[in-house]
């Protein structure tokens, strides 16, 4: 994926085949039909696929580790495999370089640091992944069967438990993990899908992709689900919980604001790599920054989350992300969302704002440019924009989502600012228009008496009242100050 033609490789799936032909290029054969062979797809699979299981015994990325061999119990002992410990299998994805990427060594090191007694095994299927994408997709099923074979052999040792197995798959590797979980005799404890690949997996049968049936607990991070009409990561939910950081598309720090520049200078592949690989770094972050866990919140769609509607933790509606995710098994997939920083630690602090706006005059279809500053006992926020996902409803309560990169502590006051031309100049312009017998523009004045704030991380709710009840109006170029309401500091909203 370091190669500059990474994105072009995906685009070739769409530009080089007739419309609709991709449906015939999906992974062939049911997982439960062991003897079915793909037809109509060029597959470069040898009789004995090149898949190795390398147990990492050192944090040094230059250390080669020790290769396990199915059926060789003596080698298992010599490699220091602990039959009663947790066992992690890390499964990489498609590769254009034929080499491991730097993220793999970081993930190995983070797991070894967090779980010192655990077995960390790298599933090396580079010879089968270093192919045309459509061939690598076909090979995922074969690799999944090899992983299942290794797990079945380990189970024969008696002390080894599938419940202690955690398969971690990135991109195509996530679907390899799904195949392994489906083929194995018994149920794997957990599978984590790190931005599972989308092309040729989107919308297919559950037996041909990662699904909740593949392990006792399947959690998924989606970080690159949509870009220019092509989703490199899978959009659809495929686990018990599916987490979409920043909506699951453009990730902070990955060059979204300079997309055209990326095209111009040939660095689009780096932007793609950043977005797609962000899932891995979020997982690593959850291992190394235990004191700064990131929380995700259940929501039906990203727009509702952007509006700040979904910050409830009742009935398991919020969860940690990454390694610390709590097991949730429901009949339906739980889609969850959160905001993040551009780098480690990725944690931010979410706030829901409920603002009742009303007007004594006809304000028409008004879209104010509002900013808010939160003042806390630990720190003050920056001037935060209130994103208007849908139009402002007058004489009604409007909900917003804001987030900060640092912990503010207990909030004690709020400043609300309406950016733009001051009201005096606006009124002067209206009078001039009236003099010329032109219809007046709608009044640009809002009245706000109270703001209710809820912290997503602490679930605490506080009400803030305008400083002077008689001065609750705000127009462009003005600001309003709010302080904790004397009689209603803690609210139920």
From Swiss-Prot:
Heparin binds at residues 327-339. Glycans are attached at residues 67, 82, 395. SUPFAM superfamilies: alpha/beta-Hydrolases, Lipase/lipooxygenase domain (PLAT/LH2 domain). Exerts both phospholipase and triglyceride lipase activities. More active as a phospholipase than a triglyceride lipase. Hydrolyzes triglycerides, both with short-chain fatty acyl groups (tributyrin) and long-chain fatty acyl groups (triolein) with similar levels of activity toward both types of substrates. Hydrolyzes high density lipoproteins (HDL) more efficiently than other lipoproteins. Gene3D superfamilies: alpha/beta hydrolase, PLAT/LH2 domain. GO terms for biological process: cholesterol homeostasis; fatty acid biosynthetic process; high-density lipoprotein particle remodeling; phospholipid homeostasis; positive regulation of cholesterol transport; positive regulation of high-density lipoprotein particle clearance; regulation of lipoprotein metabolic process; response to nutrient. It catalyses: a triacylglycerol + H2O = a diacylglycerol + a fatty acid + H(+); a 1,2-diacyl-sn-glycero-3-phosphocholine + H2O = a 2-acyl-sn-glycero-3-phosphocholine + a fatty acid + H(+); 1,2,3-tri-(9Z-octadecenoyl)-glycerol + H2O = di-(9Z)-octadecenoylglycerol + (9Z)-octadecenoate + H(+); 1,2,3-tributanoylglycerol + H2O = dibutanoylglycerol + butanoate + H(+). GO terms for molecular function: heparin binding; lipoprotein lipase activity; phospholipase A1 activity; phospholipase activity; triacylglycerol lipase activity. This is Endothelial lipase. It is found in: Secreted. It is termed endothelial lipase due to the fact that it is synthesized in endothelial cells, a characteristic that distinguishes it from other members of the family. However, this protein is also expressed in other cell types. It is an enzyme of class 3 (hydrolase). Disulfide bonds join 66-79, 254-274, 299-318, 310-313, 465-485. Its main location: secreted. Head to tail Homodimer. Pfam families: Lipase (PF00151), PLAT (PF01477). SMART domains: LH2. One of its GO terms (cellular component) is Golgi apparatus. Belongs to the AB hydrolase superfamily. Lipase family. It comes from Rattus norvegicus (Rat). Residues 349-484 form the PLAT domain. Keywords: Disulfide bond, Glycoprotein, Heparin-binding, Hydrolase, Lipid degradation, Lipid metabolism, Secreted, Signal. The active site is at 171 (nucleophile), 195 (charge relay system), 276 (charge relay system).
């Amino acid at each position: 994926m370091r190669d500059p033609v990474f994105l072009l490789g995906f685009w070739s799936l769409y530009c080089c085949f007739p419309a609709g032909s991709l449906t015939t290029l999906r992974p062939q054969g049911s997982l439960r039909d062991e003897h079915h062979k793909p037809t109509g797809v060029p597959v470069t699979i040898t009789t004995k696929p090149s898949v190795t299981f390398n147990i990492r015994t050192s944090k040094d990325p230059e250390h080669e580790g020790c290769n396990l061999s199915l059926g060789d119990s003596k080698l298992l002992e010599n490699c220091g495999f602990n039959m009663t410990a947790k066992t992690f299998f890390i499964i990489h994805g498609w590769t254009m370089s034929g080499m491991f990427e730097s993220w793999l060594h970081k993930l190995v090191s983070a797991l070894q640091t967090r779980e010192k007694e655990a077995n960390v095994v790298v599933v090396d299927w580079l010879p089968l992944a270093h192919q045309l994408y459509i061939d690598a997709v076909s090979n995922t099923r074969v690799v999944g069967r090899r992983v299942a074979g290794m797990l079945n052999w380990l189970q024969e040792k008696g002390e080894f438990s599938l419940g202690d197995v955690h398969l971690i798959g990135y991109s195509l590797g996530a679907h390899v993990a799904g195949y392994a979980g489906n083929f194995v005799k018994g149920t794997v404890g957990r599978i984590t899908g790190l931005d599972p690949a989308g092309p040729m997996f989107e919308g297919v049968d559950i037996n041909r992709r990662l699904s909740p049936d593949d392990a006792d607990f399947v959690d998924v991070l989606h970080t690159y689900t949509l870009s220019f009409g092509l989703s490199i990561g899978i959009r659809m939910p495929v686990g018990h919980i599916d987490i979409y950081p920043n909506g699951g598309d453009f990730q902070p720090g990955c060059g979204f604001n300079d997309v055209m520049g990326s095209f111009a200078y040939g660095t689009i592949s780096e932007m793609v790599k950043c977005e797609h690989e962000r899932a891995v770094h979020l997982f690593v972050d959850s291992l190394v920054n235990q004191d700064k866990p990131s929380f995700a919140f259940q929501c039906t769609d990203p727009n509702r989350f952007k509006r700040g509607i979904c910050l409830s933790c009742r009935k398991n509606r919020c969860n940690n992300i990454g390694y610390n995710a709590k097991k949730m098994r429901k009949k339906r997939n739980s889609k969850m969302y959160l905001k993040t920083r551009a780098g480690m630690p990725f944690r931010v602090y979410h706030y829901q704002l409920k603002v009742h706006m009303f007007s004594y005059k006809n304000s028409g279809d008004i879209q104010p440019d509002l900013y808010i500053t939160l003042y806390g006992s630990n720190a003050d926020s920056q001037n935060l924009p209130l994103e208007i996902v849908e139009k402002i409803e007058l004489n009604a309560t409007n909900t917003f989502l804001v987030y900060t990169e640092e912990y503010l502590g207990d909030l004690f006051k709020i400043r609300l600012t309406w950016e733009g031309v001051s009201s005096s100049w606006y009124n002067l312009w209206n009078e001039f228009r009236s003099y010329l017998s032109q219809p007046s523009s709608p009044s640009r004045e809002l009245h706000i008496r109270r703001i209710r704030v809820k912290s997503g991380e602490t679930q605490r709710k506080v009400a803030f009242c305008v400083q002077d009840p008689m001065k609750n109006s705000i127009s462009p170029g003005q600001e309003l100050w709010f302080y904790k309401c004397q009689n209603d500091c803690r609210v139920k909203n």
